[in-house]
């Protein structure tokens, strides 16, 4: 974190991307704290501020829509809302629900 301004000053960069889980672990925090701990919020804001000051796009992994909205309000302009596995699972649950199931049961196959 002390070098974030120097990192943002590297010629040719268009943006930077924050991985909150990696950042939390590097700060000695647990994953449950990756978007709630005051030290994490300060770090995230510091990174976003350094990117903005350097004219870079600041990106972050949010993991869900609510966190994504909160990160957009903090100034992040590129936000991933889910991993591939999260998106596939949610999509499958929605399709099962639409087909008459509740999305929580395992597929039984043909009987």
Predicted segments, located by residue:
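Expand to "…catalyze enediolate/carbanion chemistry for C-C bond making/breaking, isomerization
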Residues: 1-111
């Amino acid at each position: 974190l002390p070098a974030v301004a120097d990192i943002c000053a590297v010629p040719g960069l268009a943006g930077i991307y924050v991985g909150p889980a990696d950042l939390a672990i590097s700060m000695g925090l647990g994953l449950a704290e990756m978007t709630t701990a005051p030290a994490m919020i300060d770090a995230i804001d510091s990174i976003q501020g350094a990117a903005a000051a350097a004219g870079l796009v600041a990106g972050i992994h949010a993991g869900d829509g609510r966190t994504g909205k909160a990160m957009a309000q903090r100034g992040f302009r590129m936000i991933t809302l889910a991993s591939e596995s999260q998106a596939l699972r949610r999509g499958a649950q929605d399709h099962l629900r639409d087909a008459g199931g509740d999305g929580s049961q395992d597929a039984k196959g043909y009987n």
